């Protein structure tokens, strides 16, 4: 499956608040198609821009050796980075606060512990999705930059990707640490509830093909310890979304046998989380 279709199918699976914060891959491709390739196209583009752009914009584009269309494309890429960073940092802060709250609640009564365990499971799933968000957007940027270089004969992919590597949305060390702490909390809670959740854990082991999907089935097999059908449905949706996200990410990372400086590391093991944060 081509990346654009894979990304689109992934976005459809996400919660509404996530959907508009992924890479605008289609818009970037449309903008790229407005850029004429080669020297003749560059001359024509320069003629077009003189009448329709401000002197400041033309001067800035010319100073960078770009046509107006090229400068607009790069400007759109920079806007995408700002969008990724804002969303990623907002989510990361939300997860830090939520995890601290769950850590403080996990020593409560048996009934409350079951509720906390379910919330940890859901939080774990959302953090896995945010890791996936980071990797998908990075991959999309690399692919669209490759198309840009090929069309224009420019070589902006390497310097732009070097800038991307320093962006908050790509720096997942803290997120990786939070994911591991979630797993440790789940391990600590398991002995406390081993009698009441033994049956659901057996089900988890058989169904948990991906990390994040394993614990997410807890809400559907706890004998009513977690009230609310809406909550059960949300956990089921989360499990499905995480599983689809990891499957798409595996497909993207293993889609080419050619390894380059721009390649993401492969996913190892069945849970997709053996690699350290970037």
From Swiss-Prot:
InterPro entries: SPX_dom, SPX_prot. Residues 191-242, 255-278 are annotated as: Disordered. GO terms for cellular component: nucleus. The keyword Nucleus applies. Pfam families: SPX. Keywords: Nucleus. GO terms for biological process: cellular response to cold; cellular response to phosphate starvation; negative regulation of unidimensional cell growth; regulation of leaf development. The SPX domain is sufficient for inhibition of PHR2 binding to DNA. This is SPX domain-containing protein 2.
